[in-house]
């Protein structure tokens, strides 16, 4: 057996040769490099940021958002885009469904003038454009809406009744193999919005599955299941939806946490509604009957009135948000620049 000093010398020579061939940093001891906190992009809902465990969507990773129709998938993605832009980032939207509403996006806070938008003809074109944008290194967030609309060229050029089994799954698998390393190097967050389908003949367990094969399930660091659970009403008028998001996969924090928040029609995720819910849960806002009180000051009777008060008094809303984040230890790092607020815990890879 080779003596320990000889083995160490052989290892050093091998590492030197690898670095000479592939560049400095191509191989290293994990202990030699200080672990960097995971930079995040806030989602727009403090409840969802808490459920994700790190204060938002991780940068440099693949994120999948899926759920039934009109459940709020695109709204969640657009809020992340707005937050990335607010921090000075560059955002791109691959609109494969050709259904992006610029006016709605603007109401959610998206800077539509600077948003890069592509409406590709084929799935290959969409993913090639996405890959080129990611490799530019200039992008902070990329949204692909949706995986189901990424139609392979062969299917588009074929006849209506032709069978094209597995084409889309192979396309997604190849694209994700190429993209994953580039995403990590550039720090770009790629959000894939996906639709649900039902498997035929399933007797036990959920028959629901997502489109595009299994590759996205493996490559995604975060998978979020978005569901509409209740219609919000003001009197008899429907004004929005109560939405539940379950984190079904999370490689950067413990998974299977849930978050609930309000999505208001024409306005998106209600930041104030999330602050009221989390404020009550964490003991900063007192609820007595239907009245909400913060530090002796009445916010209003009923959630709608309390929501209106916080919308009109932004400094109170910011104060509540700051206290919640400080107590739960989230939101310290939201860009690539390290702050003095503290270091996030090391990621847990499940």
From Swiss-Prot:
Give its localization. Cytoplasm
Can you tell which superkingdom this protein's organism belongs to? Bacteria
* Keyword Cytoplasm (UniProt): yes
Q: Which GO terms describe its biological process?
A: DNA recombination; DNA repair; SOS response
InterPro entries reported in the protein's UniProt record: AAA+_ATPase, DNA_recomb/repair_RecA, DNA_recomb/repair_RecA_CS, P-loop_NTPase, RecA-like_C, RecA-like_N, RecA_ATP-bd, RecA_C_sf
Keyword hit for DNA damage = yes
Print the keywords alphabetically. Answer: ATP-binding, Cytoplasm, DNA damage, DNA recombination, DNA repair, DNA-binding, Nucleotide-binding, SOS response
* MF terms (GO), sorted A to Z: ATP binding; ATP hydrolysis activity; ATP-dependent DNA damage sensor activity; damaged DNA binding; single-stranded DNA binding
In terms of PROSITE patterns, this protein maps to: RECA_1, RECA_2, RECA_3
Per the record, the similarity remark reads: Belongs to the RecA family.
The record describes the protein's role as: Can catalyze the hydrolysis of ATP in the presence of single-stranded DNA, the ATP-dependent uptake of single-stranded DNA by duplex DNA, and the ATP-dependent hybridization of homologous single-stranded DNAs. It interacts with LexA causing its activation and leading to its autocatalytic cleavage.
Q: PANTHER family given for it?
A: MITOCHONDRIAL DNA REPAIR PROTEIN RECA HOMOLOG-RELATED (PTHR45900:SF1), RECA (PTHR45900)
What name does this protein carry? Protein RecA
Q: Which organism is it from?
A: Mycolicibacterium paratuberculosis (strain ATCC BAA-968 / K-10) (Mycobacterium paratuberculosis)
């Amino acid at each position: 057996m080779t003596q320990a000093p000889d083995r160490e010398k052989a290892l050093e020579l091998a590492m030197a040769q690898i670095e000479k061939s592939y560049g400095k940093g191509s191989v290293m001891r994990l202990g030699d490099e200080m672990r960097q906190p995971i930079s995040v992009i806030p989602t727009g809902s403090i409840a969802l940021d808490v459920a994700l465990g790190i204060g938002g969507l991780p940068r440099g990773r693949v994120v999948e958002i899926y759920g039934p129709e009109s459940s709020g998938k695109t709204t969640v993605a657009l809020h992340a885009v707005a937050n990335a832009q607010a921090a000075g980032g560059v955002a791109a939207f691959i609109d494969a469904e050709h259904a992006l509403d610029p006016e709605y996006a603007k109401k959610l806070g998206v800077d539509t003038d600077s948003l890069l938008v592509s409406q590709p003809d084929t799935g290959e074109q969409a993913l090639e454009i996405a890959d080129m944008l990611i490799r530019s290194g200039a992008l902070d967030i990329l949204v692909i809406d949706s995986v189901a609309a990424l139609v392979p060229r062969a299917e588009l050029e074929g006849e209506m009744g032709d069978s094209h089994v597995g084409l889309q799954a192979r396309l997604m698998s190849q694209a994700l193999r190429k993209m994953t390393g580039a995403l990590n190097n550039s720090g770009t967050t790629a959000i894939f919005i996906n639709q649900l389908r039902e498997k035929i003949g399933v007797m036990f367990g959920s028959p629901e599955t997502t489109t595009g094969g299994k590759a996205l399930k493996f490559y995604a660091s975060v998978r979020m299941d978005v569901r509409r659970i209740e219609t919000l009403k003001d009197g008899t008028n429907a004004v929005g939806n109560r939405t539940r998001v379950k984190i079904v996969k999370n490689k950067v924090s413990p998974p299977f946490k849930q978050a609930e928040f309000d999505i208001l029609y024409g306005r998106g995720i209600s930041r104030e509604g999330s602050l009221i819910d989390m404020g009550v849960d964490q003991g900063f806002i007192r609820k007595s009957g239907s009245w909400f009180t913060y530090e002796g000051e009445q916010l209003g009777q009923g959630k709608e009135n309390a929501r209106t008060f916080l919308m009109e008094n932004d400094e109170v809303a910011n104060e509540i948000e700051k206290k919640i984040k400080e107590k739960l230890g989230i939101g310290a790092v939201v860009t690539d620049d390290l702050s003095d607020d503290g270091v996030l815990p090391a990621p847990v890879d499940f």
